[in-house]
C-alpha cells in the first residue's frame, strides 16, 4: 500500500509562507509540525533561530541536523505548547501545518503562557477537507458529533 502523503497543496503552502514572512522584519518562526523539513528548506533556511516540533524520532533527528541554530523538540506539539515550550524565544511567526485539524494546536498556543510580541503572523494549513475527502472524518475530534449522527461517508460530497 502506498505511503500516505498530504503534499497536494505544497506550492500554495510555500507561497503563503513566503508572502507572510514579508510582514515581519525579524521573523522568529515556530513550526508546529516539522515533518521532513521541506517547508523549512524552501522558506525558513535563512533564519538563524526558531522552534520546531516533530513527534517522530527519525524526523526530529533530521530536523536537528537541518537547522542547528533552532530549538528542535521531539514532542507532541499540543502538549508541549500548552506547557509553554519554545517560550524562550520571542516567536512572532506561527506556522501550523498538521495532518488534520489545526484547532487544538492553535488553542494550545494561544492558551499557553509565553511572551507575546506586538505583532504575530499566523499561517495555517487546515487538512480537514482532505480528511473528509478520504472518509477519515472519524479521526478528527471536532467532527466526532457529526460523524456519530450522519456517519463518515456522507461528510464530503463532490
Where in this protein do the model-derived segments appear?
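S-adenosyl-L-methionine
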Residues: 1-62, 66, 77
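Acidic/glycine-enriched edge-of-secondary-structure segments
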Residues: 2, 64, 69, 148-154
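A generic structural motif
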Residues: 53, 74, 123-127
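Short, conserved active-site loop motifs that form the nucleotide-linked donor/cofactor pocket
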Residues: 69-71, 120
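Cofactor-binding loops of NAD(P)H-dependent oxidoreductases
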Residues: 73-75, 96
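Class I S-adenosyl-L-methionine
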Residues: 81-93, 98-158
Amino acid at each position: 500500500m502506498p505511503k500516505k502523503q498530504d503534499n497536494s497543496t505544497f506550492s500554495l503552502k510555500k507561497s503563503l509562507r513566503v508572502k507572510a514572512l514579508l510582514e515581519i522584519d525579524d521573523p522568529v518562526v515556530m513550526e508546529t509540525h516539522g515533518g521532513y523539513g521541506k517547508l523549512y528548506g524552501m522558506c525558513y533556511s535563512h533564519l538563524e533561530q526558531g522552534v520546531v516540533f516533530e513527534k517522530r524520532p527519525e524526523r526530529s533527528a533530521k530536523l536537528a541536523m537541518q537547522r542547528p541554530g533552532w530549538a528542535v523538540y521531539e514532542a507532541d506539539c499540543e502538549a508541549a505548547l500548552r506547557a509553554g515550550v519554545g517560550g524562550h524565544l520571542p516567536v512572532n511567526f506561527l506556522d501550523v501545518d498538521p495532518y488534520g485539524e489545526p484547532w487544538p494546536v492553535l488553542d494550545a498556543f494561544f492558551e499557553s503562557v509565553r511572551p507575546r510580541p506586538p505583532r504575530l503572523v499566523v499561517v495555517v494549513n487546515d487538512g480537514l477537507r482532505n480528511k473528509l475527502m478520504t472518509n477519515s472524518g472519524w479521526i478528527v475530534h471536532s467532527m466526532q458529533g457529526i460523524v456519530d449522527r450522519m456517519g463518515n461517508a456522507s461528510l464530503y460530497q463532490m
